[in-house]
Amino acid sequence: MEPFTMHRGVAAPLLRINIDTDAIIPSREMKRVSRHGLAEGLFAGWRYLAGTDRSPDPLFVLNQPEYTGASILLAGSNFGCGSSREHAVWALKEFGIRAIVAPGFGAIFHNNCVRNGLLPVVLPMATVQALADDCAAAPATRQVTVDLRQLEVVSPAGARYGFTLGSEQRQMLLEGLDPIALTLKLASSIDAFQGADRLRRPWIHFDG
């Protein structure tokens, strides 16, 4: 998994509240076995004009020229609520989103983000709106910096906003560790425990 230390990119505002995982990627877009190719279905209900063969809706933010290549999403509260489908995170990642800034996330979605190297940043709605306003006022760049090492977000105008993240989740992102890789870092401790437990309770260990 690619480590996340600091990222600077175009931030696109999608400030609707309660954007659920079915809106992020509708179930009809999940007919493939592989996680690859899901970016095409990201926000499919909003990105494409209804009744067309995937003609882009020019009013949807990610289709607007000024947000081409957006890699940071500014969102409303409770982003990623709904079902536990990990496809929502996979689609965002494949599209190029590296961080999402919102007042809150669905709990399972938040964990899925960390497990897949996508940084969920929790900031008050007023701060998210201020970031969106700063981006709108700086049309030449619309660049926001998200620094996981310093735990801060920097607006195009230079305003700095601190955020928090659990220490284990921060370690996973900084070092690019999925849950298995994080567990393997404790391999020596696990082996030591098993060795001691084998001596203490030999009857529960089967070596045959």
Curated annotation (Swiss-Prot):
Family annotation (CDD domains): IPMI_Swivel (cd01577)
Subunit structure: Heterodimer of LeuC and LeuD.
Keywords tagged on the record: Amino-acid biosynthesis, Branched-chain amino acid biosynthesis, Leucine biosynthesis, Lyase
EC numbers on record: 4.2.1.33
Protein name (Swiss-Prot/TrEMBL): 3-isopropylmalate dehydratase small subunit
Stated role: Catalyzes the isomerization between 2-isopropylmalate and 3-isopropylmalate, via the formation of 2-isopropylmaleate.
GO terms for MF: 3-isopropylmalate dehydratase activity
Pfam families with a match to the protein in the record: Aconitase_C
UniProt family annotation: Belongs to the LeuD family. LeuD type 1 subfamily.
InterPro entries the record matches: 3-IsopropMal_deHydase_ssu, Aconitase/3IPM_dehydase_swvl, AconitaseA/IPMdHydase_ssu_swvl, IPMI_Swivel, LeuD
Protein's gene: leuD
Transit peptide keyword on record: no
Naturally occurring in which organism (per UniProt): Cupriavidus necator
Pathway noted in the entry: Amino-acid biosynthesis; L-leucine biosynthesis; L-leucine from 3-methyl-2-oxobutanoate: step 2/4
Catalytic reaction list: (2R,3S)-3-isopropylmalate = (2S)-2-isopropylmalate
GO biological process: L-leucine biosynthetic process
A cellular-component GO term for this protein: 3-isopropylmalate dehydratase complex
